[in-house]
Amino acid sequence: MFIWDPRSKKCGERRKSLVQNIDMAPTILRYFGIEPPKDMQGFDLERTIRDDTPVREAALFGIHGGHVNVTDGRYVYMRGWVEGGEACHYNYTLTPMHIHTRFSVEELGQAEYVDGFSFTKGLKVLKVPGTGRGSSPQTRETFLFDLENDYGQMDPVQDSEVEERMIHYMLQLMQENDAPEPIFVSEGCCRN
């Protein structure tokens, strides 16, 4: 990520701290003296840019219907679906669209209104069973990569102690992100 923050007067330097794109909005808002909304995730990067002060221990990432991934900057853990996990895959939306098409009549016929999430500000959402691409895993494999020794993520490693720590980060961040219960089931995890 390339970022310039006039508050820091830093230019042409690298940082090692783990940041995410979601940190951009709070950084820009605070630069202009505006407090981010309470449900906005991410951190102001002013101190990270100035002197590499960390803002997080781990970051959650992935794509809808794919692996749930977490990194601590050293390791990347990619959690695959468990057998039968696709039965727990749903689309949660108020805009019943796939990327290129509307939801079908059959899909909408199976939809139900459910309580929303912290970021839907009290609105209920449609819960639609996942169908089509992105609703069944391309692989059920789980991977752990050591970026220090395999930056290209070509050779997964086996390390139960690291995997346990990464699962802890993943569960903690999924809970903080208000992940719906079925995703914990599809990934073979339980909430703490």
Features from the language model and the residues they span:
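WW-domain-binding short linear motifs
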Residues: 56-60, 165, 181-184, 188
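Substrate-binding rim/cap in mid-to-C-terminal beta-strand-loop elements of soluble/periplasmic
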Residues: 1-39, 43-53, 68, 79-81
